[in-house]
Amino acid sequence: MPQFTKEQEKAINDRGHDILVSASAGSGKTTVLVERVLKEILAGTQVDELLVVTFTKAAAEEMKTRIKAALTKEMAKPGVDYRYLREQLNQIDTANISTIDAFCLDVIHRFYYSIELDPSFTILTDDTQATLLKERALREIEGEMLTSKDKAFRHFYDNFAGDRDADSPRDLLLDLYNFAMAKPEYKKWLAQLPQIYEIEDSVIGSKIWQKQIKPYIATKFSKLQEKIASYLTQAIMETKELAKVKESFTLFAQNLNNFVQAVKEDDDYDKQRELLRSCVFTINFRKSKKWDEDLLEFYNEIQSLKDEAKSQVFDTFTSFYAVTEKEQIKIMQESQKIVTAISTAEIKLIERFNQLKRNENLLDYSDMEQLAYQILSQDTSSSQMARDFYQNKFKEILIDEYQDINALQERIIQQIKSEKKNTLFMVGDVKQSIYGFRQAEPSLFLQKYHQFAEDENEHEERILLSDNFRSTEPVTQTVNAVFKSILSTDFGGIDYQKEGQLIFGAKYYPKSLPQASEVIVHEKKNNNEKSENEIDFSEIQMVLARIKQLEDEHVQIFDSNTGKMRDMEYSDIAILTRSRSDNLEIMQEFAKQDIPLFVTDAENYFQTFELTVMMNYLKIIDNPDQDIPLVTVLRSPLFNFDEKELAKIRIKSKNSNFYSALTSYVGTNDVLSKKCKNFLNQLAELRSFATTHRISELIWSIYERTNLLEIMTALPNGEQRRVNLEALYERATSYESAGFKGLYQFINFIDRMRRSQKDLAQPLLTKEAGNAVRLMTIHGSKGLEFPIVFYVGMQHHYQMRDLNGNYIINSDSMGITLREQNYRVDSLVKAMGNITKKQQLLEEEARILYVALTRAKQKLILVGDVPSFNKKVKEWSTELNHAGQLPLINKLSATSPLSFIGPSLRFDRHVAIKLNDITKSIDQSQKILFIDYQDEDTKFIKKDEDTDNQNENTRKSALLTQTVNKLYQFNYPFRDASETTAYQAVSEIKKAFNDPIDAELENSHLLTSTNRYLQPIDTKPNFLYQTKFTGAEIGTATHLILQYYDYTNDSADNLDQEIATLIEQKKLNPDIVSSLNKDQIDWFVHGDFAKDFWKEPTNLKREVDFSSLLSARTLFKDFSDPDAKILVHGTIDGYFVAKNGIILFDYKTDHVNKTNIDKSIELIKEKYTGQLRLYEQALNEFSEKKVIGKYLILLDAKQVVEVK
């Protein structure tokens, strides 16, 4: 941007009051924010007097980098205060330019004493560990409340623990936990949840009815009344042919008016119920074959109105009037008891979870915000001190992406805001608020958006940034065409037509560049094709074909770096999807066509093929009488049963489950029976094995018996598959280490993780993408831009399963379904909650669509499929009203992005759509709509007009057909990978040291999919040689005792006391004690090496976590970038701070060969030298004293070995 617009200037320069900047996509938001910070600094505000809050670490780092660059540029100008600017530049890295979590952590570190918090806490960064601790808390609370004969809790539990979903009570409590943790006063919020159920002897007088249901019904039907009235007054209704239609609608209108009046006047509930019931049967008419075209056309409109009216009446009746008032009161009263029990249980869960974390001195991310708010909000002198500190420290608080803030974060900001001392500068775009699953509340943005516009006082200002400097005019017009029909004050909270439209501002593009946006639609006629929740194979082929075509046409891209035109490259293209579920299939199809594809986020870990197979195998080991898991395993590469074989087995035993059929087929003397017998023998062995072994041992046994690791490694993306399977083994180990047992419980735990979308996958490659097409989710693309964007899966159905469950949680309420003996019925709170939640979900889906479409710089291509294209076009043509808006009822009935896009683009007066059939070689199933933007007064172009353009489009369609027909040969490109992540664990690095002295990896294998340098794991795990506990488990237990050993207690039974304490705290499994070698522990703690520990125990540091940036080439000789750094994370067993330096040590429980002890010790020493050197380097970086000695404590040999 060569210069700032008038509105940008205001956002940069206006001072002295609170400002909300509503910045549309591509409007230069970050540039404006950086320029404002620069102007503040130049005006004398020091950088440490500003608080700049973002919501991601990447955004915070980018902000720092940009501010540094701006300051550096300013310093080069003549006449500036160079010394002052240099001082500000040096402070950027330590300034409060950070995520809100990082700021909260600063608050806790400064004022921990005000809430009596141990300052040596550790941040819990492992989601699995946090989940396991939460699971433990949940099980403890569940067990206590069920055994305490608490009738209310039992009622809650029975209401949700149905035969089909025994985990539903737990799921509810875990879901509620996420909502509660985003609230500033979570206990108060939980305690008020039952209040909305309060009801005495009248439904009409209840809180829920008066505050929510009554206004909703009145508003909903007033719009329908107006619509009906407008039709009844039309002249055509006076014709005798429509006499019955008019009579029917007039009667319906009268009944509806009576009902609405009864609602407004708070008439008796049962009276309202009967009035609404009378509306259902009053609209009844038919059309006549004798009518002319005008009458038939009008009839179609009135028929649509009839359907809408019936639908609204029926939905309202089933939601709010399904039962009598007496029954409704009983449902509300019973529901209130259950919600009270839920609220009580949730508070207990939170408190128990917090206690478990405190016992380990751990904090998780939700703790940071909760504790920071606690510190800042209490009515105490220490809290006042904290508030005063930050209010005096910061002259301005700048919040980026303000639309993503939640209620707790907003309250934290308000605690450090002072009307007299500082101001707020908030910038964001509510149209891009897409993090509802993180409890982001766009309503907070909208509240200020409307308030600041209405007040127009000297204390508050709203600034709109609408100029788009990212996209060409066709892209901005496509975005406007879609969203001016969708976003409105009653859907999305803003009037897009008046205040939200993008203004084309990228005037730097050459005039010859603009290209039409495109919609590519595949007509899906085969019922066997994929569901509407998946991307169709033909859809992928259309994308591939269009890319090939663009490449063959030498499509030109304007390069903003050089200011010149150039040929399109693969890296100019991004493919955006709503979810990651189809990523692997897309990757495989691109590999077949040798088009490079860079995937920024993997498929959901639990949905990968290898994990699906493995989890299903575990399910049938637990219980083989499960048809779907059993058939999945049989069909997998482990056993390779094909469809014919499975059909043959089923035909032989049609009336039994598949396991019985399989067992029965073994008696048949043929090749297939042997195959069945082999499978059943292995299954029987594994089921027996499972009864006497740990889950982790069972998993590894499956890997060994089936060669699963090798089979999956041989498939495309095989190394990633292998790592995913190894990760499952690690998760099982962690699960058992946390004290959990049982295969069934483990399967349920994984299922809950899957349902909550906890992704445990190892990261994919983070190498430079190079010249490759990018594939990413829409959420992953936020903040990015690409010359050409394909948005695929327009038909993908929106997920509304939350509405079908037994509970619904909103920001201010929780609605439940009451379970009676033979039926379930929604409470009024649940019915109203469903309506609210559905609109919230659909509004967010519209905003997600906005983010997707605004990523494109020069060309936007929308791709999807429909069952019947012509039928869809006909539907779309009637949906927009005279103002060019989709009616609210249509928006609330949307099932996919295509529900929004189709009507918007089909009937926009700026858009001419030319429909061309692709030739029969692909079964005429593909349709392409080339969208060209005309002047405002251009009329809609029919198919027989503009022949030249049609011929050109036909030529393009034929070329696309030829390209599709070329896509056949499979030529999978195996590529060597030599990249690594920017993060490495020492436990991984030490595996990679072939030569620990030189720290080289010349002979090691590179596991591409994990993106970490590792040697292949081919050795059997130690537990296969153990009868009870593994060497690793015994070693871990030994480390634990040495970690907590009390060097201030010299009693003879000190060791036994320590062990007993650890068992009591549930940190140590009592069963392992007999396997410990206490003599080894006694040798060390009372030996010469530890004698100084007794003298100065405070100088002894144990289990110290560290993170350190090291040169990549220090670790990996062949790393290409000599300047690259890698973040190394590890845990040091211990070090002692002596007067002259640091003595570093590490316990090792490795077996020492007593027959050749010297050689054995030397091998162990070589094995761990590299690891200790990393620890030494890290300690030297963050400690004032230097390491003067490194030692391995070899417990098995009872020797202390120095490492040079």
UniProtKB/Swiss-Prot annotation:
SUPFAM superfamilies: P-loop containing nucleoside triphosphate hydrolases, Restriction endonuclease-like. ATP binds at residues 23-30. It catalyses: Couples ATP hydrolysis with the unwinding of duplex DNA by translocating in the 3'-5' direction; ATP + H2O = ADP + phosphate + H(+). InterPro entries: AddA (IPR014152), DNA_helicase_UvrD-like_C (IPR014017), DNA_helicase_UvrD/REP (IPR000212), P-loop_NTPase (IPR027417), PDDEXK-like_dom_sf (IPR011604), Restrct_endonuc-II-like (IPR011335), UvrD-like_ATP-bd (IPR014016). Its EC number is 3.1.-.-, 5.6.2.4. It comes from the Bacteria. Pfam families: UvrD-helicase (PF00580), UvrD_C (PF13361). GO terms for cellular component: cytosol; DNA helicase complex. Its cofactor is Mg(2+). Residues 2-472 form the UvrD-like helicase ATP-binding domain. Residues 500-783 form the UvrD-like helicase C-terminal domain. One of its GO terms (biological process) is double-strand break repair via homologous recombination. One of its GO terms (molecular function) is 3'-5' DNA helicase activity. Keywords: ATP-binding, DNA damage, DNA repair, DNA-binding, Exonuclease, Helicase, Hydrolase, Isomerase, Nuclease, Nucleotide-binding. The heterodimer acts as both an ATP-dependent DNA helicase and an ATP-dependent, dual-direction single-stranded exonuclease. Recognizes the chi site generating a DNA molecule suitable for the initiation of homologous recombination. The AddA nuclease domain is required for chi fragment generation; this subunit has the helicase and 3' -> 5' nuclease activities. Belongs to the helicase family. AddA subfamily. Heterodimer of AddA and AddB/RexB. This is ATP-dependent helicase/nuclease subunit A. The gene is addA.
